[in-house]
Amino acid sequence: MFKQNFKNDVVEIRGQKIGLGESKLIKIPIDRLPTGTLIEIPIYVFNGKTLGPTILLQGGLHGDEVNSIELVRRMLIDKSYKIHRGCVIVVPLLNVFGFLNMSRDMHGKDVNRSFPGSKTGSLASRMAYYLMEEITNNVDFAIDFHTGGEQRNNFPQIRYTPEDGIGFELAKIFNAPFMFSSKLIPKSFRNQCFKNNIPVIVYEGGESLRLEENAIQHGIDGTLRVLKHFNMIHRNVEVSKNPTSIHINKRNWIRAKVAGLFTSTVKNGEKVEKGQTLGHIMDTYGETNFTIKSPSNGYIIAKNNFPIINMGDALFHLGNP
């Protein structure tokens, strides 16, 4: 299923060539701050000594998703990218502007809704353009690391495109606690890669602006499983053994039927039964207490950690195998 016509004999990014057995740090200039400070995207390229697949590992597409940045950074520090076959292109932090401003977006625009981008467009559009033109065209497949947003915590999970058979196989190899298919979103990175016949899986773990060790470690372990599967790193690299991913076939958000203060009585990732109490919504005066019950058997694959909620807010993401 995975193609064998590998192209990592010479990898070229921004006019710089990286041959077999070479590694290089490349910085792509994007723009300057109003102070004149140059903002660059750091790209690490680790090319093995023999031909093999080229994989992109990307963090920080959304600037506030710090778990995605930390897990890629930690693998750099731990020297997990000692590649002897194939090539790994590592982008620890794509959305530098969003990161500096602790924001998902870049100047009000979502980079992940800006693909394929434009060389002369907005900052978000230009960043999308350089990612596709300078980096992604080199790769055979990619892992895009994310977290939940707006204080929604995603239990470690892998998402793949329904029509992408290779993505499905990659998701199984990654072996996160949960995996499921997710429809393509127009102008997203995954959508553009699908159009370009580049399989992408998306790892989601934790929530924005919070470092969470469990989410970080699951992301690292899954990435190492993929690298080991393709013999890109040595077999003696230790990876923790997970139970086989639970494949979620149906998902729905349980939403608040009233406004108030929200408390949860279940843990993220927990298996729940139909009718089980999941949490409570109380008014600020202690007069009402609305009980939230599970509509079916399943697993909590994400939960809202924000205590002040309005009617209709998403509280629990329930997944059914």
Feature names for model-found ranges:
Residues M1-P321:
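Structured catalytic-domain cores with a bias toward divalent-metal coordination
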